[in-house]
Each structure stands twice: as C-alpha cells, then as structure tokens.
From Swiss-Prot:
Compositionally biased spans, kind Low complexity: 279-324
Alphabetic keyword roster: Capsid protein, Repeat, Virion
Name of the protein described by the UniProt record: Capsid protein p87
Cross-referenced InterPro entries: Nucleo_P80/P87
Principal subcellular localization: virion
Subcellular location(s) of the protein: Virion
Length: 624
C-alpha cells in the first residue's frame, strides 16, 4: 500500500472517530509533516476526545444550543435548521462513502479468493460454484459502471458472498499437513542418502551410473586435498576426475580394497585337466594351502560369481551351491551341472590346456581408427604422450578412450573458433562502418544543394516552412522506394559501439523515440500542412522522406559530438537493450498508420546521391 492510500485511510478513520473534518484535513494537508508524524497527530487527536461521546454528538450539541437560546430561535430560526440539516447531510455523505469503500473491499476480497481457488488445483473447489461467483462479480461491476441503484449492486455482491460461504467447508489442513510432512522429510533426509544405499564402485564403468551427489561423496572420502568445484564446468568433468582418482588409487595399492573391488576372478586349479572356460570345483581336501580372499557378496548382488568357491570362502552361500564330491569323474560333474541338457558322452580332453585363460574375459570390439583431433598450434608443439601410459590402460579404459578424446577435440574446436572470431573482430576494432556511411551520405546530400541544410532538430516535428524548396524539388523525383516504416534499430545501431559512461547515448535514443512518436501522432497534420505548398502527387512518401532526412541530419550532428568516445568491438549491452525496447515502441507507433502509396517504379533519372540517401533511410548500407 502506497503513501496516498495510507493517508486516505487515516483521514477517513480520523473523521469517523473525531467528527472534526476541518482539523483532520489540516493535519493531513500539512506539507511539513511526514507520513508517520501525520498518523501520530491523528492518533493524539482521537485520544484527546472524551470517551463515551455519542455518534450523533454534533446533532445533539446543535439542538442543545438551539434550545438554550430562545431569543436566537425567534430571531433567526432558519439558521438553526440549516445547521442541523448540514450536519445530517455531512453524515449521510460520509456514510455513503463508507458503504462504497466497503463494497470495494468486499469485491476485491472475493476476486482474490476466487483466483486462488482456481489456480490452486490441489484445493478441490467446486468449479460450478466458482463460475457462478465470477458471473455475480461481473454483474456487480456492470451494474456499478452503469449507475444502477445501491440495492441492485448490493444484491449481486451478497449473492457472490453467499455462494462463497458454501465453499468455506473446504479443509486446507490436509494440504498443509502434506506439505509440512514433505518439507520435514526433505530437511531430515541426509544429503548422501542415495549414495549410501548404492554399492561402492568396483570398476570404472560403475562411475557412469553415479549421479553428482554420489560422485561428490566418493571424491570427499578418497581425495585428501581440497576439491575445487569451480574448475569443473559439468558433471562429466567431475566424473572424469573421480575416475582418475580411482585409477590412481588402484594403481598405488598392490591389492585392491575390499570395500571397492571384488576379489580377482581366477579359477581354482584342478588335478585333472579341464577344457577352457569350464567352471572348476575345489574342495578343502584338494586345496588345503590356498589362501582365501575375503569377499563382499552383499555389496554386489548383481555380479555373478564365475567359479564355485569353498565353504571357507563363502559360508553364507554354501547351502545354495552344489557340494561336489572329490571322487567324481569329470563327466559326472558336468552331467550333474547340466542335468536337463543332452551332452556328448566320452569327449576326449584336449592335449594342451591353457591355465592362464580368464573366465568371462571381455572381447574387444573392432572399430575404425578415430579421426585426428583438431588442435591448436600450442598443442601441436606440445610433446606427445608417453606410450607407457597408453599400454597401462585397461580394457575398460580403452573403451572410453574414444569418447574422452572426442570431447577434448570438440572443446579445442570451440576454443579455436573463438580465437578466430576474436582475431576477426580485432581487425575492425575502432571502425564503425555504418556510422561512416550515415555521415558521408548525409553530408553529401546537404552539400549538394543549399536548400537541403536541415534547420530543425528532433525536439519537435519538421516544419513545412523549413523545407519549402526541398519539397518542390523532391516532387520531380521518384519517391516510391521510400519505405513507410522506420528502421529505428538499424539506423541507431552504430551508437551501441561506443563506450559511453555518461549515458548521453541512452538519452539520445530516448529523444529519438519521442521524435518519431510525435511524428506518428501528427502525421495527418503534417500531411495537410505540407500539401498546402503543393499539391503533391506522392504526399505520404514526401512526408516520410522529410521525417527521416531531418532525423539523419540530427544524427550526423550527434556523431560529431561523441567522436571522442572510445569505440568497442562488440555492442554495449546496456545501450543495446535500450535500443531494442525503443525500436518496438517506434514500430508500433508507425504500424498503426494508414498510407496512400504508389507502385514502386524504377526511375533512373534520380540523382545518385538521392538514391543513396533513400537506401540509407531503408537501412540498406550496401551503398558504397
């Protein structure tokens, strides 16, 4: 609520409580007091009154005075009656004012309530009732604007209130309890709740399934130094950093950590030779001295165990695994594993068996060699990477090597593009080609004929008396190519390439906007004023030519005033934003006008300087 509304409410309350309108107006209209001082003065005035003063104190006081002075009643009875009637009239006027303000407040409260219930879909309000309330409010506004009686206006308002009372049984407690419960769960839940439920990464591919919170927890738990998130622009950079941290950690430790990596999947050696990639069985009697690595099956439930282990290794999984017998032959063991499958009998074993083969070894994919990376001159001069680093990469890292190199290549390509663009802009730094063309073409038009010297500025609309000779001369030329729109943005774009700290350029843009708005409002008057010196066959094109030519003359003069300002290679953001907004206003002003134009014809008898000037007015800078 602003200051005027506060003063109005305070004055109304003071008049109601004190019945002294003159003194309240004196306090309200005192310019030396601030808002708080006025409110304090009205409060002190109300407190100074005697408590228990009746509502009609003024009327009773006037009646008592009349009764106590019978001489005055006999002398001038009409004056006493006038005083009483004036007091009653003032009270009636104040009551009417209060009733009107009460209707306004009730109407606004109902509008706010209906809008809230319509927009909040989670509050299940009856749509039919809301529509009836809206209809009653619209009827209230129509009756109020048409000057209907107070009873009709109050009837519509009371109907809307009665309909709204039917919606008061809507309970918002369920909605508020649900939102408070969600907020409490969000506050109480730890930040790393999802990260704690997921298993720790045991291979490099596991990092691709982690989100940013899980990656952050892994880095905080395994990185001793301070991690700077500002150096990493995306989630992929954080993921690559976590992968590098995992590689360094697995390379430094001789044995993998129990909580992050599974034990090596090496099959147990057997006494009898077995074909490649066949599960091996081992009992405690066959391997009494083999060490048993600790395994963590609870952290990797989806990872299948490639080989059956002994009871000492996984006592929890022993009941679900078949118990092999030491004196079984190789055929019986395989048959017990694949009972429902027809297997060939008496298959001879191979002569040689490679025990170094690993079960479940991932086969490498063959693909075409990648394209050479697009790098800058600095990278070409950099020494090549060490081949030992490349040989030490695992198969999983080689699968992602192409993706990482492609990502780096794209970054280098973007950097090279920005460097070339900056180099290209640096060649034109300090050169404003559009400004130079505007100055040269406008000066050429002014110097060709004496009558082209612009006498007006953009502070007002161009006067016909200043362009009498020019109008008669232009009537012999073809002006059908003059566009009936104003290219405000294109003509004033050179101003955005100046570094102006005093806001002179922004002020000129606002002045140019006012100039074109005034010309659009007075276009009909200018047409009649210019036609008095004619008549002219192409009067609309003639008026538009004078409007634009007068502006170009003033713009050329303004360029001379800001010639000492430093130039920019790119537009000033502040100036450019103002120019875009003002361009919309100018186009809207001229878009509402109607013109009487002729067909465009090619008349080569027009002089070259006039053709260049018309092209410049149409924002066509290909003139030189």
């Amino acid at each position: 609520m602003d200051e005027q509304h506060s003063l109005r409410i305070a004055a109304l309350a003071g008049e109601i409580l004190t019945r002294d309108r003159a003194q309240v107006n004196t306090i309200i209209h005192s310019p030396e007091r601030a808002l708080g001082q006025k409110l304090d003065a009205i409060t002190a005035l109300v407190d100074s009154m005697q408590p228990g003063t009746p509502r009609d104190a003024a009327v009773n006081e006037a009646a008592n005075v009349t009764a106590q002075s019978p001489m005055s009643e006999t002398q001038d009875p009409q004056r006493a009656n006038d005083n009483v009637s004036d007091t009653v009239a003032n009270e009636n006027a104040q009551n009417l004012l209060l009733e009107g303000q009460d209707r306004v407040l009730r109407h606004r409260v109902l509008q706010i309530a209906v809008t809230f219930l319509q927009r909040n879909k989670r509050v299940k309000a009856n749509a039919t009732t809301l529509a009836q309330i809206e209809e009653a409010l619209r009827n209230y506004e129509t009756a109020k604007n048409s000057g209907a009686s107070d009873s009709v206006i109050d009837g519509f308002l009371e109907r809307a209130e009665s309909l709204f009372n039917t919606l008061k049984n809507i309970s918002l407690s369920e909605l508020l309890d649900r939102e408070s419960a969600v907020f409490a769960d969000t506050e109480s839940a730890p930040r790393t709740q999802t990260a704690d439920n997921s298993p720790p990464p045991v291979s490099e591919q596991d990092f691709d399934r982690l989100d940013i919170s899980q990656l952050t927890d892994y880095i905080e738990n395994n990185y001793r130094d301070q991690f700077d998130f500002d150096k990493h622009n995306s989630v992929e950079d954080v993921r690559n950093f976590a992968k590098n941290l995992w590689r360094n950690k697995t390379r430094v430790t001789s044995t993998p950590l129990q909580e992050y990596q599974m034990p090596p999947q090496t099959p147990a050696p057997l006494q009898d030779q077995m074909p490649p990639q066949t599960p091996a069985y081992a009992t405690p009697a066959q391997q009494p001295s083999q060490p048993t690595p600790a395994q963590t099956p609870a952290q990797q439930p989806s990872q299948p165990t490639p080989a059956y282990v002994t009871s000492a290794q996984t006592p929890a999984q022993q009941p679900s695994q078949p118990t092999p017998v030491s004196n079984y032959s190789w055929e019986r063991r395989v048959a017990s594993m694949f009972a429902n499958t027809d297997l060939p009998q008496n298959v001879p074993l191979p002569d040689s068996y490679d025990t170094s083969s690993v079960i479940g070894q991932k086969r490498r994919k063959r693909r075409a060699p990648p394209l050479p990376p697009y790098s800058s001159d600095e990278e070409d001069a950099a020494p090549p990477r060490s081949p030992k680093r490349k040989e030490s990469l695992s198969s999983s890292e080689e699968d992602e090597f192409d993706y990482e190199r492609e990502q780096k290549r794209r970054r280098e390509e973007d950097k090279n593009f920005l460097r070339l663009k900056a180099l290209e802009l640096s060649k034109y730094a300090g050169v404003n080609e559009r400004m130079e063309k505007i100055v040269r073409v406008t000066k050429a038009m002014q110097q060709t004929y004496d009558y082209c010297n612009c006498k007006n500025t953009i502070s007002g609309t161009p006067a016909a008396a200043s362009f009498i000779n020019l109008l008669r001369r232009l009537n012999t030329y073809n002006l059908s190519h003059v566009e009936m729109t104003v290219n405000f943005y294109e003509l004033l774009y050179p101003l955005t390439l100046y570094n102006d700290e005093s806001n002179r350029i922004v002020g000129y843009i606002f002045a140019a906007t006012n100039y074109f708005q005034n010309c659009a409002k007075n276009f009909g008057r200018m047409r009649a004023e210019f036609n008095e010196h004619g008549p002219f066959a192409q009067i609309d094109s003639l008026v538009m030519f004078v409007i634009k030519f007068n502006f170009l003359c003033d713009l050329q003069t303004f360029f001379g005033k800001i010639d000492g300002l430093p130039m920019l290679a790119q537009p000033n953001i502040k100036t450019h934003t103002v120019l875009v907004m003002r361009d919309k206003i100018v186009k809207l002003a001229f878009g509402a006008l109607q013109y009487d134009t002729s067909l465009k014809t090619d008349n080569r008898r027009d002089p070259k300087h006039l053709q260049r000037l018309i092209q410049l007015m149409n924002a066509d800078f290909n003139i030189m």
